[in-house]
C-alpha cells in the first residue's frame, strides 16, 4: 500500500481553492439544456433575408425539444446534443405587398450530423407566396444552418468556460498573477467591465392606436415618459445620452435614434448582474390608423426572461395604451 501522499496522482484530491476536479481527471457533466434554448432563440429569431421579390424574417421560436450536455474527462470535452426545432417565419411580397407566413422545422440537430447535412424543412400556409417560400428554402436555409453553427461554436467555447481547470502548478502561477492584477486594478482608475452570463433574446410586437410620431415621442420626451411610468425620469434622448426610469430600476444609454423610425438602447434592470446590459431595439412601423411597435432585445439574462416580458408588456405597453386613451378622452 502506498504511503500517505504517495498514491496515484490521478486519484489524489489536491488542496485547491476551488476544490474541483484536480488535474481534470474525474468525469464531470454540465447540463446545457436551458442555456442552449436561450442561445438558439437568440441566434435564430430575427434572421432576415431579402431579394428582388420579397423579404422574409424568422419571427418566433415555436418549439425547441431535446437536450444538451457537456462532459469533461481526462482533460477532454465531450458534447452531446439532440434538438427538434420549429420556427415561424413571415414575409412580404414586394410587388403586391401581400404578406405570408410559414414554418421551418429542424427535426434532428445532433452531434451525429454535420451542420451542412442537417435537415431544414420549409413550409408555407395555404395560398400564394411560393416566391417567398423559395427565398426561405435557399437563402433562409443557409442562414439557419449558419446560426446553428454559431450555436455549436458558442456551446464549445462560451458555455464550457471553466470546465477544463489548470493543474496545481499552473493554477498557482495564475493565482499569483491574478493577485498582482487585482492589486494594480485597485491602484488604477476603475473600468466598467461587462460579465458573461447565459442570455436569451426576445421579440415582441404590439399595435397602438396612434401615429408613429406620437408613439416615438412617448419614448423620447421626458414628460411623456414620466406620465406612462408614473414616476420621475432622467432622459437625454440623443446618441450617447443616459436614461433612468421607474425610480432608477431601469437605466441605460441611447445608442442610436432615427426620428419616428428606430431607437436602439443599452438597457438594464437594477437587479441584473453588475455592468450587464441588454441591447434593446424599437422599430416604429406605420399601419392603417395604427402604429406597430417591434421590439427586439438581445442579451437578457436567462433567469430574467419572464421579468423582462412583464416589464415591457405590462409596465410599458399597457401603461402607454392607458396614456393614449386618456389623451384621446381629454382632446
From Swiss-Prot:
Gene Ontology molecular function: any one: protein-folding chaperone binding
Q: Which UniProt keywords apply?
A: Chaperone, Stress response
Q: Which InterPro entries match?
A: Aha1 (IPR036338), AHSA1-like_N (IPR015310), ASHA1/2-like_C (IPR013538), START-like_dom_sf (IPR023393)
- Taking the record's annotation, the residue ranges forming a coiled coil are none
The source's domain of life comes to: Eukaryota
Give the Pfam families listed for this entry. Aha1_N (PF09229), AHSA1 (PF08327)
- Alphabetized SUPFAM superfamilies for the sequence: Activator of Hsp90 ATPase, Aha1, Bet v1-like
Tell me yes or no: is Metal-binding among this UniProt entry's keywords. no
Q: Which family does it belong to?
A: Belongs to the AHA1 family.
Give the protein's function.
Answer: Co-chaperone that stimulates HSP90 ATPase activity.
Name listed for the protein in its UniProt record: Activator of 90 kDa heat shock protein ATPase homolog 2
Q: What organism does the record attribute this protein to?
A: Mus musculus (Mouse)
Q: Per UniProt, what is the name of the gene that codes for the protein in this document?
A: Ahsa2
Amino acid at each position: 500500500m502506498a504511503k500517505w501522499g504517495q498514491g496515484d496522482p490521478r486519484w489524489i484530491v489536491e488542496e485547491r481553492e476551488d476544490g474541483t476536479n484536480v488535474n481534470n481527471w474525474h468525469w464531470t457533466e454540465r447540463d446545457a439544456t436551458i442555456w442552449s434554448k436561450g442561445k438558439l432563440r437568440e441566434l435564430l429569431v430575427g434572421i432576415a433575408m431579402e431579394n428582388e421579390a420579397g423579404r422574409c424574417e424568422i419571427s418566433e421560436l415555436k418549439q425547441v425539444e431535446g437536450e444538451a450536455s457537456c462532459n469533461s474527462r481526462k482533460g477532454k470535452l465531450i458534447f452531446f446534443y439532440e434538438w427538434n426545432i420549429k420556427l415561424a417565419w413571415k414575409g412580404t411580397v414586394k410587388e403586391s405587398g401581400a404578406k405570408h407566413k410559414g414554418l421551418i422545422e429542424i427535426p434532428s440537430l445532433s452531434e451525429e450530423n454535420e451542420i451542412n447535412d442537417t435537415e431544414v424543412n420549409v413550409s408555407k400556409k395555404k395560398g400564394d407566396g411560393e416566391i417567398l417560400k423559395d427565398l426561405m428554402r435557399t437563402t433562409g436555409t443557409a442562414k439557419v444552418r449558419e446560426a446553428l453553427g454559431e450555436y455549436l461554436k458558442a456551446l464549445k467555447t462560451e458555455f464550457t468556460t471553466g470546465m477544463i481547470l489548470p493543474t496545481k502548478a499552473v493554477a498557482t502561477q495564475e493565482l499569483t498573477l491574478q493577485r498582482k492584477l487585482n492589486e494594480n486594478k485597485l491602484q488604477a482608475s476603475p473600468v466598467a467591465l461587462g460579465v458573461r452570463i447565459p442570455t436569451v433574446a426576445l421579440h415582441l410586437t404590439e399595435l397602438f392606436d396612434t401615429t408613429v410620431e406620437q408613439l416615438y415621442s412617448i419614448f423620447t420626451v421626458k414628460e411623456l415618459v414620466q406620465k406612462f411610468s408614473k414616476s420621475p425620469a432622467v432622459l437625454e434622448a440623443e446618441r450617447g445620452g443616459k436614461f433612468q426610469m421607474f425610480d432608477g430600476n431601469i437605466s441605460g444609454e441611447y445608442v442610436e435614434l432615427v426620428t419616428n423610425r428606430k431607437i436602439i438602447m443599452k438597457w438594464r434592470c437594477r437587479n441584473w448582474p453588475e455592468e450587464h446590459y441588454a441591447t434593446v431595439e424599437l422599430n416604429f412601423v406605420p399601419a392603417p390608423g395604427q402604429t406597430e411597435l417591434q421590439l427586439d432585445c438581445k442579451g437578457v439574462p436567462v433567469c430574467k426572461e419572464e421579468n423582462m416580458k412583464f416589464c415591457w408588456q405590462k409596465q410599458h405597453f399597457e401603461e402607454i395604451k392607458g396614456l393614449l386613451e386618456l389623451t384621446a378622452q381629454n382632446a
